[in-house]
Regions:
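N-terminal pre-P-loop "Q-motif" helix
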Residues: 25-44, 59
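Walker A/P-loop
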Residues: 43-63, 369
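Conserved beta-strand position immediately N-terminal to the Walker
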Residues: 46-50, 74-75, 239
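Conserved P-loop NTPase motor core of helicases/translocases
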Residues: 16-22, 65, 73-180, 189, ...
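Dynamic helix-loop-helix/coil hinge segments at AAA+ ATPase domain boundaries and subdomain interfaces
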Residues: 20-29, 311
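Interdomain "pre-motor" coupling segment immediately N-terminal to P-loop NTPase/helicase cores
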Residues: 1-15
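Conserved helicase motor core of SF1/SF2 NTP-dependent helicases
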Residues: 70-72, 80-82, 166-167, 172-444
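Phosphate/oxyanion-binding active-site loops and adjacent basic polyanion-contact surfaces
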Residues: 29-33, 52, 56, 60, ...
Length: 444
């Protein structure tokens, strides 16, 4: 059956496409994803939660095509250009999979032209009203006005608009959305969240907030914005995406307590390990490193046993030395996809100073939303006399969740056990690792 896309744009009205909603729920093998799509179709305010790797962007991309006939335009918003491009790539894939030849202007990637890319086949043009206004080469002001008017019409006729929350700040003045899907909603600032809510044209429009309520709040420490997301989650009974498609079961077990043990690892990643990517065995002579690098141990705690004392200002050079040895071991095996992270900026600078250039080094907060094959975490604190708040109050549940969920195949925590067990969340994680034979004391 042939079904038209309804739109004010005559160029689109007169075109017909077979199976305009080809993304029926049976094509999604994941039950939670089908449940979310069903709920988005039937409700106007829907919160969706889930840790990284559970298919939140998959839900967004399918929802776009499911909503366009009744709720056009669908505006998709995410905090960063990288996140927006990731969703665009999934939309592009779905369009190709269904053999849809989307017309010019059907999908718009809205924002600053210098930040955008033509790498996706479904993206025919890039456009920003601000860029038009900033052009000074126009022969007359009337010509400039005509271009701006044409640009506004172009946006009005779009069916799917993708943008960052920053670029979306003036989009509401140009077009009213039938549906707004907010990706990583817990990271969107308060003022921008309000603008996005007001961009929906009426009470019958849809607002879909998607994120992880166990992750960190916005970098600006806009805790009010985060509380809005949490309030939505608490009041509208979110659907949790439970199936993990990114990291193995042992890594999942570290964060599962924070999700009330509701998460499961998909069979495709359940048993993945560094053995899958190692080019050769470790042939070094460091017995500490040899134990830590064993493929069967997918989560490891390296206990410095109080011998690597924390210096002033949240710096621990002993842990830096241990991490250097571990990295050297991995690189000798041909494994270079490694994240090195820490809760503290001072330790971040120390790691950057002493470890080789080109490594991915940063604080836990900076790595939120990123991933790699192996993650090494420097916990720094090593002071048995410190009370809980002084020693580890900064390492809360969201920060722990982010740290533990950066890697696909192996997570290594380096720290002083006697200090870290004062934090009940870290203590639980250390116990989990110990039960899986991943606890090692670094012998000097």
């Amino acid at each position: 059956m042939m079904t038209p896309f309804t739109s004010k744009n005559n160029n689109i009205d007169n075109k017909y496409y077979e199976n305009t909603n080809p993304y029926d729920f049976t094509q999604l093998e994941n039950f939670e994803q089908r449940t979310v799509l069903d709920r988005i179709r039937s409700e106007n305010r829907v919160p969706v939660t889930g840790p990284p790797g559970t298919g939140k962007s998959t839900v967004i991309s399918h929802s776009c095509f499911d909503l366009i006939n009744e709720y056009s335009p669908v505006i998709v918003v995410s905090p960063t250009n990288a996140m927006v491009n990731s969703i665009l790539a999934k939309i592009d894939f779905l369009a190709k999979q269904a053999n849809l030849q989307l017309p010019r202007g059907f999908i718009i990637r809205y924002g600053n032209l210098s930040e955008l890319s033509y790498s996706h086949s479904c993206l025919k043009e890039k456009y920003s009203i601000d860029d038009l206004v900033q052009q000074r080469c126009c022969s007359s002001s009337a010509y400039l006005v005509d271009k701006i008017t044409a640009g506004r019409d172009y946006i009005h006729n779009a069916r799917i608009i993708l943008t960052t929350d920053y670029s979306a700040k003036d989009l509401g003045n140009v077009v009213q959305a039938g549906a707004v899907l907010i990706d990583e909603a817990g990271l969107v600032r308060l003022d921008r969240m309000g603008m996005l809510f007001s961009s929906v044209r009426d009470n019958n429009g849809k607002i879909i907030v998607i994120g992880d309520d166990k992750q960190l709040p916005p970098p600006s420490h806009d805790y009010v914005a985060n509380s809005i997301f949490l309030s939505i989650v608490r009041n509208f009974k979110p659907t949790l995406l439970r199936t993990e498609y990114r990291y193995n079961k042992d890594i999942l077990d570290l964060i599962n307590p924070y999700y009330n043990y509701q998460l499961v690892a998909d069979f495709s990643v359940k048993e993945i390990s560094t053995a899958d990517i190692a080019k050769r065995d470790y042939r070094g002579t460091n017995n500490n490193v040899r134990k830590i690098l064993k493929h069967e141990n997918k989560t490891v705690f390296v206990d410095t046993d109080g011998t690597s004392r924390e210096q002033r200002h949240f710096i621990n050079t002993g842990e830096v030395s241990i991490i250097k040895d571990i990295i050297d071991g991995y690189q000798s095996m041909g494994i270079n996809n490694i994240i090195v992270t820490t809760p503290y900026k001072q330790q971040e600078r120390m790691l950057q100073l002493y470890l080789q250039k080109g490594l991915r080094i940063g604080t836990i907060d900076k790595f939120q939303g990123q991933e790699d094959e192996v993650t090494i975490i420097s916990m720094v604190r090593s002071n048995s006399k410190s009370d809980y708040q002084e020693a580890l109050g900064f390492v809360n549940i969201p920060r722990s969740c982010v740290a533990f969920s950066r890697s696909k195949r192996k997570t290594i925590i380096v720290g002083d056990r006697d200090t870290l067990i004062k934090n009940k969340f870290l203590s639980k994680s250390i116990d989990t690792i110990t039960r899986k034979d991943g606890f090692f004391i670094w012998r000097y």
